[in-house]
């Protein structure tokens, strides 16, 4: 008996590393020291920083992986993994530095795993961060053969004096919602139940334009890092930012608001996607659950002073991101719960 007969193919693992090497190294920034294969990734801090703060984040892709693996769509979930981490850390105004990934699988499929890593590398390039390293664990008997799970880890940097933490938010500030590409990477346990109930197959279509349902459900999560850096480089004063993930607007936007503040959201300020309309209809999902599960077409929010509203919108549109003013910051009445106004409670 040997390791391979026990389910772990070391030679396939080595071949996999060689296969992904070019994709990984294509993400490297000038600050990266050394190459792939060391025990730890090395990277210098960018020059010119006076009081740098490191910002870290970690996340996964959730049960979207089940749907993606069932339909052999591996590249997109690599982008999802980067987006779920990067979109969190940039809410502080930080610029992504590097990314690490962890993949666990029942049996290494070099082709599928390479697609995932190429997606991760794609997401890193879009975000300006280096894919500094990773781990692929082959775990036969723990994961079913052909199945894998993903985790990502991102580190970003921001000048301490430029940190965006919501403390400068005040009543009258405007909330700009930036479009999502669809469901992103949250709510897929519910999505999968809806698909099961509706008897969907890989060719099923929906909506007035007869779009392919699975294509839209598996669309990669939008990356907002380059847009945020563009907004900041245009000296737009951003008071707060929120990544709209699990829990939707009602649970994520308040995370960037200081105590004593809430927001009134105008739910008609942006068009409701036919994808969410289909999910609600096919799954008989109550309106409140819809808003508390999905992003409802808004993947990221900016909180800006009134005078910065139009400039911020212009920068979003110039960078090919749809965006709308979707609400306003209000002072919370004494003794009143700070839940968002204007959305199903």
Swiss-Prot record:
Any one GO MF annotation of this record: phosphoribosylamine-glycine ligase activity
Catalysed reaction equations from the record: 2-formamido-N(1)-(5-O-phospho-beta-D-ribosyl)acetamidine + ATP = 5-amino-1-(5-phospho-beta-D-ribosyl)imidazole + ADP + phosphate + H(+)
GO cellular component, one term: cytosol
Keyword ATP-binding: yes
Keyword Nucleotide-binding part of the UniProt annotation: yes
Chief place where the protein resides: cytoplasm
The EC number(s) this enzyme carries: 6.3.3.1
Pathway(s) the chain acts in: Purine metabolism; IMP biosynthesis via de novo pathway; 5-amino-1-(5-phospho-D-ribosyl)imidazole from N(2)-formyl-N(1)-(5-phospho-D-ribosyl)glycinamide: step 2/2
Signal peptide as annotated in the record: none
Keywords (A to Z) from UniProt: ATP-binding, Cytoplasm, Ligase, Nucleotide-binding, Purine biosynthesis
A biological process from GO: adenine biosynthetic process
Cellular localisation: Cytoplasm
Family label: Belongs to the AIR synthase family.
Designated name of the protein: Phosphoribosylformylglycinamidine cyclo-ligase
Organism: Synechococcus sp. (strain CC9902)
């Amino acid at each position: 008996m040997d390791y391979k007969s026990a389910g772990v193919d070391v030679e396939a693992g080595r071949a996999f590393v060689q296969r992904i090497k070019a994709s990984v190294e294509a993400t490297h920034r000038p600050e990266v020291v050394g190459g792939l294969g060391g025990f730890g990734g090395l990277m210098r801090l960018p020059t010119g920083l006076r009081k740098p703060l490191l910002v870290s984040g970690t996340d996964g892709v959730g049960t979207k992986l089940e749907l993606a693996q069932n339909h052999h769509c591996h590249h997109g979930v690599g982008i999802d993994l980067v987006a779920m981490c990067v979109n969190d850390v940039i809410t502080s105004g930080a610029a992504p530095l590097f990314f690490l990934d962890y993949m666990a699988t029942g049996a290494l499929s070099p082709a599928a795993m390479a697609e995932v890593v190429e997606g991760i590398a794609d997401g890193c390039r879009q975000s300006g961060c280096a894919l500094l390293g990773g781990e692929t664990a082959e775990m036969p008997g723990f994961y079913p053969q052909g199945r894998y799970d993903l985790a990502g880890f991102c580190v970003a940097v921001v000048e301490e004096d430029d940190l965006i933490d919501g403390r400068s938010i005040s009543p009258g500030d405007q909330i700009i919602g930036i479009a999502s590409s669809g469901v992103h990477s949250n709510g897929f346990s519910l999505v999968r139940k809806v698909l099961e109930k509706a008897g969907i197959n890989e060719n099923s279509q929906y909506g007035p334009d007869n779009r392919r349902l699975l294509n839209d459900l598996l669309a990669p999560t939008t990356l907002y890092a380059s847009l945020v850096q563009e907004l900041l480089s245009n000296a737009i004063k951003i008071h707060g930012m929120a990544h709209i993930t699990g829990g939707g607007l009602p649970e994520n936007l308040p995370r960037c608001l200081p105590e004593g503040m809430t927001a009134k959201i105008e739910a008609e300020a942006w068009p409701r996607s036919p994808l969410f309309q289909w999910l609600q209809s096919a799954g008989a999902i109550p309106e409140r659950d819809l808003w508390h599960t999905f992003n409802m077409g808004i993947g990221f929010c900016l909180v800006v002073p009134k005078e910065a509203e139009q400039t911020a919108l212009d920068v979003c549109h110039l960078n090919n991101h749809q965006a709308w003013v979707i609400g306003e910051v209000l002072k919370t009445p004494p003794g009143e719960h700070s839940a968002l106004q204007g959305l199903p409670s």
